[in-house]
Amino acid sequence: MPVDTKRIRGPEESQSPLLFLSPDKAPKAPSSRQGVRGNGDVRPVFARCGLVSQAKGSAYIEAGNTKIICSVYGPKETERRDETDMKTGRLVCDFRLAPFSCVKRGAWIQGSEERDLSATLMESLRPGVCLHRYPRSQIDVNVMVLENDGSVLAHAVTCASMALADAGIEMYDIVLGCTLRQSGNACLVDPSYAEECGSWQEGYGDNQGCVTLALLPNLNQVSGLNADGEMREDTLTEAMRTCMDGCHKLYPVVQQALTRAVKKKAPPPEK
């Protein structure tokens, strides 16, 4: 059997040796972020709907330097071989990072990270969409990250949910996302790219990781949860509560953007 001789054979999962340093030898991680924003504050958000004229619905969102645009196409008829699946619609999500969006230039071909993010995005959005109202139909959600400055998955969930609402897709509730970076006993809500992958990732000891949560705010139900790293159970529970609070902080901005889009599409009053 031919093998790849240039591939470095290593374990499927590995941990940083810095995690096993004794507390007295480990350097102290920062307890607060730099600047005027507090640890529990989200970045200022700019949101608009209906920017892509060719799509059934679209949305654009900015959170700091993170910029994401989403387009929704459908529902369109689809043929399936499995008769049991024809009673409900199908939600297809495509998550892509623009080659110029990250510090290191990427490729147009979708990589494994983008495929994983696409699957997580679909799992987060599906509980909020009334797929039973669209039998034998398919709804395509295309997300493009124009600039990655952290918390892209959470803001992609919010942007895609706004685009679905702008397209007139029936939903149980809007879906909002929030990310938290945990470092020891301190946490950062809506972290930037530097906070996700910079000095904060060099923390030591336990309770190190990131948590991304998707929430249906009116129903107060969690539709998606993605956690990386190693955290205690009580720390993870508190991180989820903090992310839920962050989602509720975004809700007025999203509601205002959707209201503005509806008023713009509404026909003028008859004289």
UniProtKB/Swiss-Prot annotation:
Molecular-function GO term, any one: RNA binding
Record-linked Gene3D superfamilies: GHMP Kinase, N-terminal domain
Superkingdom, natural source: Eukaryota
Compositionally biased tracts (Basic and acidic residues): 1-12
InterPro entries: ExoRNase_PH_dom1 (IPR001247), ExoRNase_PH_dom2_sf (IPR036345), PNPase/RNase_PH_dom_sf (IPR027408), Ribosomal_Su5_D2-typ_SF (IPR020568), RNase_PH (IPR050080)
GO cellular component, one term: exosome (RNase complex)
Protein name: Exosome complex component MTR3
Species, as recorded: Danio rerio (Zebrafish)
Lineage, highest ranks first: Eukaryota, Metazoa, Chordata, Craniata, Vertebrata
Gene symbol of the encoding locus: exosc6
